[in-house]
Amino acid sequence: FLNLPFWPFASVAFGAGEANAADPMSKPEVQLGLLPQQLPPGTYTLAGTVADPELASVAWGLGAYRFRRYKSGEADAIPRLELPASVDPAITAGIIDGVWLGRDLINTPASDMGPDELETAARTLAKRHGAKVTSIVGDDHLDKNFPMIHAVGRASPRPPRIIDLTWGPESAPRITLVGKGICFDTGGLDLKPSSGM
């Protein structure tokens, strides 16, 4: 990246050197994600040959992330990338939106993101995409044969929950993704010797 001494400028020169095959983060397209934090607001385009324009576009979008939950007023203008013609805007936006949502959930402190709030976030996402949400809450874990989740969750005034998000037609192949959404974890008790972990 060439930091020009004057603003506004006509172009930005960016070079990342040779990519290391063992390190995917060294790809020039991934390194492009550093620019939105460095450049002034405006609309930018990719010039020259870009080996993977979709990866470059996603990296730019991920680099433009800002956590704003506790900020008031208008969001600061951010640098925007005009997508190359070969990039599908819906796919690119879907990837970026998904990562931004995950970052927002992670960056929200446990005092504001407990099991109930996490379920609310899941229901909001489900509504937006036509998915169905069911949950198992508190003592219902015993009825559904999840005694350990119930036992651990009893240590909190906020009951634990299992949140199940289902999307897609019944006829589609079934794919299950399992994630562990820990809203707050003190690290637990060291009940086992380190050799048993």
Task: Label each region the model flagged.
Residues 1-183, 191-196:
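N-terminal hydrophobic/helix-forming segments and targeting peptides
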